[in-house]
Design a protein with these regions (language model features):
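Transmembrane beta-barrel wall of Gram-negative outer-membrane proteins
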Residues: 35-37, 141-164, 169-197
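Glycine-rich phosphate/diphosphate-binding loops that line cofactor/substrate pockets in enzymes
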Residues: 106-109, 149-157, 282-286, 357
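An acidic- and aromatic-residue-enriched active-site/binding cleft used to recognize and process polar
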Residues: 5-7, 34-38, 44-50, 109, ...
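Beta-sheet entry/capping signal
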Residues: 28, 32, 37-42, 101-103, ...
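Exposed, low-structure sequence patches enriched in small/polar residues
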Residues: 97-99, 174, 185, 191-503
Length: 503
């Protein structure tokens, strides 16, 4: 199907004034063809994802690892169930701005597979380390992802997975190949296993510069090094109606990377166990669940990095209401060569679908946690609060609101390390079957960024689409009407799309 896409962006110039960019237009093309009843091929040239809703703000002040953002592009969500494995070697957000992408999905009674190829203009790097990850935006790349899965008896399966990304403008590359399986001995016992091997060739440029080293004195700086790595997951499960037990082992070698995946940390080995009890009282509580989880982690030098135990419970009540309570105690935690052995997490979470039209949830957390951004980390008191709600105000109007806040202080509560919040409002109005309007409004108190993204859509048929929208970001001091009016516009983009199926 041919599509006409247009856009115009404005950004701040060197004088801190908003400068309009040139208008841009291009033709996009998408072809979807059924090769057979269980096999579909799809190709997209200059695919347009500008109508996809912006990512929801996340709080990363005390986080040293890259954040995971949900894949919202419909093209990449199709077939995602096949590429989901214990080791996250496929993360389609690594294909950031494709100029061309093709895919074949085959789903048979026993054999299923997917092949995805993409040429990407702006490919991100996520470089895993022991205590942090490094991120950078690279250039053009060509990616291939293949996944094969064969179903066996009673839910067992065998699987193969392979990914390969080659940078176009330098010699950087990253490949992964692996095997995974789930084998069910009977209705009670099963084992899951995955092992993947990586081969990485770094580019020789300044995209990532760091004095830190890993493995056999490799540097995180992109200086043309090449190395291989391995990741492994092994888990044994015993499942009955009232008792479930899991025990397992996993590791990531210091040199393991997955350029098409989401692997943020390496150089760790972990042994864990979990026991879960389930009771069905058939009264006000339809299900009562309680459990314990314990884990010990080391790096590949034999240094113990963490030892903790988690107690958790879940109560199921009427109107799809669930109460979750979790307490985690870290008996030992080592970060930046500093021992922090008094940290813990306490979380209480309540979610409910109170009625067909109204859902809500809230989460409260009290923590003694490492202050990771300090040169010498210390323990601090962290308070987290969040809530969300979704409401169908009418047959045509849906509204959603979320709020997340974090505050960290010294142990004596006299000094704040940081304090702030993010909030998001979503609303959609469907005037009729063809005409609709959506708006996303969000504010990040940490970055002082206010964003609004309205979108008007008109779709009289499945293959005829017209939409027009914009994305606008402002720097504001606080979330108020006056502050928004006085806030400085930092960037703005307008876009439109017209798609029509010619017969």
């Amino acid at each position: 199907m041919p599509t006409l896409v247009g856009s115009q962006a404005s950004e701040l110039d060197e004088n801190n004034a908003l400068r309009k960019g040139a208008s841009d237009g291009e033709v996009s093309m998408g072809i979807k063809y059924s090769l057979s009843s269980d096999r579909v091929a799809e190709i997209a040239i200059n695919p347009d994802f500008s109508q996809v809703e912006a990512d929801e703000e996340q709080i990363d002040v005390n986080t040293t690892f890259a954040l995971n953002y949900q894949e919202k592009r419909p093209f990449f969500n199709e077939g995602a169930d096949l590429t989901d494995t214990p080791v996250d070697v496929v993360y389609t957000r690594s294909i950031n701005n494709p100029t061309g992408v093709g895919r074949i999905i085959s789903r048979g009674q026993k054999d299923s597979w997917v092949l995805l190829s993409a040429l990407d203009d702006d490919s991100p790097y996520i470089v895993p380390g022991e205590e942090q990850s490094f991120t950078s935006m690279g250039g053009k790349s060509f990616s291939n992802i293949f996944r094969y899965k064969r179903s066996l008896k009673e839910g067992s399966f065998l699987g193969l997975i392979a990914t390969d990304r080659r940078m176009v403008n330098n010699n950087g590359s990253g490949s992964v190949v692996g095997f995974d399986t789930r084998y069910r001995f009977n209705d009670t016992y099963q084992v899951e296993f995955q092992s993947v091997f990586s081969r990485t060739q770094e580019p020789n440029d300044s995209l990532v510069v760091s004095s830190a080293t890993f493995g056999d004195n490799h540097t995180f700086t992109f200086d043309g090094e090449s190395f291989s790595g391995n990741a492994l997951e092994l888990e044994f499960q015993r499942n009955t109606e009232h008792w479930r037990v899991e025990t397992g082992y996993d590791h990531r070698t210091p040199t393991f990377r997955a350029e098409n995946g989401f692997v943020t940390n390496s150089n760790h080995r972990r042994i864990y166990g979990q026991s879960l009890w389930i009771y069905f009282p058939n009264n006000f509580f339809s299900q009562v669940l309680g459990g314990v989880h314990a884990s010990v982690g080391h790096n590949f030098d034999g240094v113990q990095k963490a030892k903790y135990i988690v107690l958790f419970s879940n109560l199921a009540m009427p109107r799809q209401t669930r109460l979750n309570v979790m307490y985690a105690r870290r008996m030992q935690y080592r970060f930046k060569d500093t021992e922090l052995n008094g940290t813990y997490d306490l979380k209480i979470n309540l979610n409910s679908q109170f009625s067909e039209r109204y859902q809500f949830g809230t989460n409260i957390g009290r923590h003694v946690a490492p202050v990771r951004f300090l040169e010498v980390p210390e323990e601090g008191r962290l308070t987290t609060t969040s809530f969300w709600t979704r409401m169908q105000a009418s047959d045509r109007l849906n509204v959603g609101l979320s709020y997340n806040s974090q505050k960290m202080t010294t142990m004596d509560r006299k000094t704040d390390y940081f304090s702030g919040y993010t909030t998001t409002l979503r609303a959609s109005y469907q005037h009729n079957k063809s005409l609709g309007f959506k708006v996303l409004i969000q504010y990040n108190d940490f970055s002082k960024d206010f964003q609004i993204q309205p979108l008007l859509t008109y779709q009289p048929s499945p293959f005829t689409i017209f939409y027009i929208g914009s994305t606008q970001n402002q720097n504001v001091n606080t979330l108020s009407y006056d502050a928004i009016n006085a806030g400085q516009l930092t960037n703005r983009q307008y876009y439109l799309k017209f798609q029509y199926l010619f017969k």
